Amino acid sequence: MTSRRAALGSEGGARIVDRGYQHYTGERRGPGWAVLAIATGTMRRSLGFKRPGLAKLLPFLIVGFAFFPGLAVIGFRVLFTGRLPRGVLSADRIFPYDNYLNWLHLVVLVLAALAAAEALCPDRRQRVLSLYYASPIRPILYLFGQVVAVVVLLLLVSVLPPLILWAANVGLADAPLSYLTSHLDQLLRIIAAGTLIACLYAALALAVASFTERRAYAAGALLGGSLAVSAVAGIIRGTIKDRWAQYPGLVDPLFLPARTTRWFFGLSLQSQISGWLYLAAAFAIIAVACFAVVRSYRSVRF
């Protein structure tokens, strides 16, 4: 037997020299760093790092769609300052922040579908959750890391682009300091609206992704389901004139963020429903979606 192994080793050009196990001698940083590693790894995968072809291109196209309108407005103002009447180049007239956020919430929805599917589906399909849970990472910490990854990624496209536009408007104003003090409330409204949009779509996307192991199914279900619910709610609002017909908008994933954003910016909702009720509906959807994710992972077999 020994001679046969030696012969095989000599013919194949490879042989076993030694076997054994070594203890990990690196720094042990605890569960917090493990959660951070999960979050950063998910963000990198969601943005297409170390992935081929379309998986790398599509996320950056989505992020580009988020930043392009704001950068275009900034470029227009820089190029035509002094050539057009001052009122024409007013920041609020060219591209109001609420309009920008209404555009962004559609972009955020698409990115949420991709990011949440990338966060939850591969580990379940490859049956590696037991490897996470064998470490100090408990299921709730694992989910927390994935939630952080998706929310931070969505904040990148829901808050940062309008913040850049706001900062540019401050810098391009005739009296930047005066503009800053008089428009500081706009900064807070941008942060509040963008954060709500990111959290709402992150919760919905993660809830959908927690029920399937395939990324395409998760992304398709979120996008298709959102369009279907929005279409039904829109038909009800458009065809039925009773007051109750406006309430399906509280569960419309496309209509609800737009109404809440208008309310944040003090604009008319053109509805008998209070802005507080829209906000409460958004929080309720987030809570139900988070409950669905936790409940789904309690029943996962691995």
Spans of features found by a protein language model:
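Long, hydrophobic alpha-helical segments
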Residues: V63-P69, D98-P122
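Membrane-interface helix starts
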Residues: G30-W33, M43-I62
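Helix-loop-helix units of permease transmembrane domains in multi-pass membrane transporters
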Residues: A119-A149
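Hydrophobic alpha-helical transmembrane segments of multi-pass membrane transport/permease proteins
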Residues: P52-V78, V110, L222-S230
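Short, contiguous pre-domain boundary segments
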Residues: S10-R29, V293
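Short, membrane-interfacial amphipathic segments enriched in basic
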Residues: Y24-T40
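Terminal transmembrane helical anchor/hairpin motif
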Residues: T2-G9, F80-D92, A216-S299
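Secretory targeting signals
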Residues: F144-L206, S210, Q270-I273
